[in-house]
């Protein structure tokens, strides 16, 4: 079923492993030996979440976490932690006295499911969920690799 690397036996809580049936269901739910769900909001469930063998109770697709609240976009600033990334959001703040803007940023820690491969510089879309730890309140829903810009042209290009 899954890579057993912990002392406790890893299993999904909604799947009965001793079933005599061998049918693999392709509908969201408990068909087969893997539970997965569609989170809605226009986000597709990744193929790795459906066919993969990882166990992650904090994954929005295969775990017990529901996405509600804010949906934010940002850039992966750090991917050094285990299953957690830091998402950097840049914005402009207006200074009334000088009638100018200054650059500011905010760092948001987000849980990343093993079904995603996230590197520094990738654009990610994160969704708010219940508190997963002391600081983590968001979950990665979609990853856009750094090389693909998604059809957006650069403003200034050399001819």
Swiss-Prot record:
Gene3D superfamilies, per database record:
2.40.50.1000
Listed InterPro entries:
NA-bd_OB-fold, Ribosomal_uS17, Ribosomal_uS17_arc/euk, Ribosomal_uS17_CS, Ribosomal_uS17_N
Methyltransferase found in the keyword field: no
An example GO CC term for this entry is: cytosolic small ribosomal subunit
Alphabetized, the UniProt keywords read: Ribonucleoprotein, Ribosomal protein, RNA-binding, rRNA-binding
User: What biological process terms from GO does the record include?
Assistant: translation
Sample GO molecular function, one term: rRNA binding
What Pfam families does this protein map onto? Ribosomal_S17 (PF00366), Ribosomal_S17_N (PF16205)
Family, similarity comment: Belongs to the universal ribosomal protein uS17 family.
Record-given protein name: Small ribosomal subunit protein uS17
Q: Native species of this protein?
A: Euphorbia esula (Leafy spurge)
Q: What is the lineage of its organism?
A: Eukaryota, Viridiplantae, Streptophyta, Embryophyta, Tracheophyta
Instruction: Identify the coding gene.
Output: RPS11
